[in-house]
Swiss-Prot record:
Belongs to the major facilitator superfamily. Proton-dependent oligopeptide transporter (POT/PTR) (TC 2.A.17) family. The keyword Transport applies. This is Protein NRT1/ PTR FAMILY 2.9. Keywords: Cell membrane, Membrane, Transmembrane, Transmembrane helix, Transport. GO terms for biological process: phloem nitrate loading; phloem transport. Pfam families: PTR2. The keyword Transmembrane helix applies. Induction: Up-regulated by nitrate after long time exposure. It comes from Arabidopsis thaliana. One of its GO terms (cellular component) is plasma membrane. Low-affinity nitrate transporter facilitating nitrate loading into root phloem. Not involved in dipeptides transport, but has a weak glucosinolate transport activity. Its main location: membrane. Expressed in roots, stems and major veins of the leaves. Detected in the companion cells of the root phloem. Disruption phenotype: Decreased nitrate content in root phloem exudates. Enhanced root-to shoot nitrate transport and plant growth under high nitrate conditions.
Length: 587
């Protein structure tokens, strides 16, 4: 392991002299993690309401903007992971990303504080003139979002591995520390989501947007201060090269040698370096075209230690099998990523449903903020995970004999099924909400929308809880799947692939919203997705998404049947144990 020197750290390349401070630096890392998540989530969790109420955007426009913002943030993780692994290392990447995130939070707050940076407030009367944002206002808002995208994209793939770097993976104490750190990481993430979706959203919706957006900026500043306060104590692993280089090299060499005749597995070049720590993989029959990159010809010269003189002319069978692992995962990744196409609808249009529902709690005047309804999704996930881990897994283990009760792909498949159920429930509830709004006395008018249905907003909770449970199965299941099926040196890349799936779903959601709106606008009954949901047919849109998810489930079952799990021949013992600790991220 190569680390940067700190005041008390010693020479590079001397792993025995690295000072792992473990829990001594966790107050800095976990403290930063808590404030950073509060800052990022607090700035973006209520964004769709902010865009419709302060920037006077139409609901469908705001939903598209939020989808593009979320998609870009998630796709940015793969760029950040590449730069982190290839050039800067985790500490420098995190440092830059956190500063960018803080500046983005400040800029977002300024759009609310400074009146020229947002359009004039619209009158509440239906049909009144409502001016949208100017180009200058949009540009400033976009600049704030770009900074937040840079921050989120850099923090997500680096935070978890950086915390694990502080523990010695070769000691019992270190391995236990890594396991506990993952538990605390999940706890702080959930805690931040809950606080942001309740307290911060309440302040933004009921007190002041200026104060509500200033809170995340202040929290981000505190996170930066805490993180940099422990700077001299951290173990800082240097960049060691991106796995993307290895993937590219295998594919390029295979193309160069495409005219060679296939050979048997025993004839393939299979040099393994003495310091190699990945799981050693056996030969597989899938994608045999790539095997040609491991066929040694007379032109392929070797060094004295057996390594190739030119790595762009000859690859080892191990390198080929690692690339096969990545390629095998991609069809599964596509299906698992589409799960979030439905998930995103629950975090956008459910908010619009709640705005035209009775959000009162009991006989009092207190109303649940529309942006806080997604907290029930988080509650469903948070409550189900320990039940799954402590009750369902031991029960299933008795019948399957598997440590996890079921395979990772079976877990994802169960989540996809519940996702379909959630969308069907959403459609049925929307039918009822709209019927009540059109046939029974209403509770007034929602600004720039329409009549507020007397249906209780509590009816929206089941669809959110179902989606939360689906995420606990499909979302966490696919994260576990990527971590276990990718080679050990590609685990940062695996984490970024998970976020890229969410990003892909965000972009697809934007396209789907545009296609449905533009297509149905010409129908005699009008658009399915108008500003006033009582005049639309949102339930048809939900049924459409449920149908798409049904087709996706069929595709998932097909590729899951085709998939072959990673074939591990032997492992370096220390690395094997470290891998087990890293897998804890999924629980």
């Amino acid at each position: 392991m190569e680390v940067e020197k700190t005041e008390k750290n010693i020479a590079e390349d001397d792993e025995s002299k690295i000072i792992y401070r473990g829990w001594k630096v966790m107050p800095f890392i976990i403290g930063n993690e808590t404030f950073e998540k509060l800052g990022i989530v607090g700035s973006s969790s209520n964004l769709v309401i902010y865009l419709t109420t302060v920037f006077n955007m139409k609901s469908i426009t705001a939903a598209k903007v939020v989808n593009i913002y979320g998609g870009t943030s998630n796709f940015g993780t793969i760029v950040a992971a590449f730069l982190c692994d290839s050039y800067f290392g985790r500490y420098k990447t995190l440092s830059f990303a956190m500063i960018a995130c803080f500046l983005g939070s400040v800029a977002m707050d300024l759009t609310a504080v400074i009146h020229p940076l947002h359009p004039a407030q619209c009158a509440k009367e239906i049909g009144s003139v409502c001016n949208g944002p100017s180009i200058g206002q949009i540009m400033f808002l976009a600049g704030a979002m770009v900074l937040l995208v840079i921050g989120a994209g850099g923090i997500r793939p680096c935070n978890l591995p950086f915390g694990a770097d502080q523990f010695d993976p070769k000691t019992k104490e270190g391995k236990r520390g890594i396991e506990s750190f993952f538990n605390w990481y999940f706890f702080t993430f959930t805690f931040a989501q809950m606080v942001s979706l309740t307290l911060i959203v309440y302040v933004q919706s009921n007190v002041s947007w200026s104060i509500g957006l200033a809170i995340p900026a202040i929290l981000m500043l505190l996170g930066c201060i805490i993180f940099f306060a422990g700077s001299k104590l951290y173990v800082k692993v240097k960049a060691s090269g991106s796995p993307i280089h290895s993937i590219t090299r295998v594919i390029v060499v295979a193309i160069k040698k495409r005219r060679l005749k296939p050979v048997g597995p025993n004839e393939l070049y299979n040099y393994i370096a003495s310091d190699f720590k990945n799981s050693k993989l056996g030969h597989t029959e899938q994608f045999r075209f790539l095997d040609k990159s491991a066929i040694q010809t007379q032109d392929d010269k070797l060094n004295k230690d057996g390594s190739p003189v030119d790595a762009w002319k000859l690859c080892s069978m191990q390198q080929v099998e690692e690339v096969k692992c990545v390629i095998r995962v991609l069809p599964v990744w596509l299906s698992a990523a589409l799960f979030y196409l439905a998930y995103i609808q629950q975090t956008t249009y459910t908010i619009f449903q709640s705005l035209q529902s009775d959000r009162r709690l009991g006989p009092g005047s207190f109303q649940i903020p529309a942006g806080s309804y997604t907290v029930f999704l988080m509650l469903g996930m948070t409550i189900f995970i320990p039940i799954y881990d402590r009750v369902l897994v031991p029960f299933l283990r008795k019948y399957t004999g598997r440590d996890g009760g079921i395979t990772q792909l079976q877990r994802v498949g169960a989540g996809l099924f519940l996702c379909i159920t959630s969308m069907m429930v959403s459609a049925i509830v929307e039918q009822y909400r709209r019927k009540v709004a059109l046939t029974k006395p209403t509770l007034g008018l929602a600004p720039r929308k329409g009549a507020i249905s007397s249906m209780s907003g509590m009816w929206l909770i089941p669809q959110l809880v179902l989606m939360g449970i689906a995420d606990a199965l499909a979302g966490v299941g696919q994260m576990e799947f990527y971590y276990k099926q990718f080679p050990e040196n590609m685990r940062s890349f695996a984490g970024s692939l998970y976020y890229c799936g969410i990003g892909l779903a965000s972009y697809l959601s934007t396209f789907l919203l545009s296609a449905v709106h533009d297509t149905t606008e010409g129908f005699s009954g009008g658009s399915w997705l108008p500003e006033d949901l009582n005049k639309g047919r949102l339930e048809y849109f939900y049924f459409l998404v449920a149908g798409m998810m049904t087709l996706n489930l069929a595709y998932f079952l097909l590729v899951s049947h085709w998939y072959r799990y990673k074939d591990v021949v032997a492992k370096d013992k220390d690395m094997d144990k470290t891998s087990a600790e890293f897998d804890k991220v999924s629980v």
